[in-house]
Amino acid sequence: GIPAADALLHTVLVGPTGSGKSTALQHLILADARAGRSVVVIDPKRDLVTDILERLPAERADEVVVIDPTSPTPVGFNPLAGPDRPEVTVDGVLAAFKALFADSWGVRSEEVLTASLLTLARQGGPAATLAAIPALLTNPAFRRQMTAGLDDPLGVSAFWAKYEAMSPQQQAQIVAPVLNKLQQLVIRPQLR
């Protein structure tokens, strides 16, 4: 196997079809599993994952999560349910949005999305998901509930005070680009 410290570096396996690349990966992955280390396997064909699951040590079986986007009961992933550092979590989510929507990204979209993400990440709980952003931006009662405990007069609290002072038409105008971007994600059950 590869020493754990070396496994943190990039590894490339190159060879023609049938030369044993998947078998080598399987051995490395199973060695990590036996050693109690976590492993992430991304396999679009599922062949490697299936082989690994068949050979996985029985004592590790309860620790396995298979994320299959074609499953009728997908495993959800909430990027806002991170550790106790909501700003770091939000920076990561925001960077992903910027990369996804680089062609249509603007200062206002970033401001609205940053305030929304920070609000939800700081509040936590089951309502703090990407799917809650439309309600946060369009439902005054939900927004009051989610912003009630915020104590950041120069940051998100200032954003929400300014937002609440806007007319419904002004609010709709500044949130429309964000809602359009989010719709592409929240419409899919696997991404909620």
Where are these regions (language model features)?
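Hydrophobic anchor at the beta1->P-loop junction of P-loop NTPases
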Residues: L13
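P-loop NTPase motor domains
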Residues: P16-S19, A24-R192
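Phosphate-binding P-loop
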Residues: G1-L8, A33
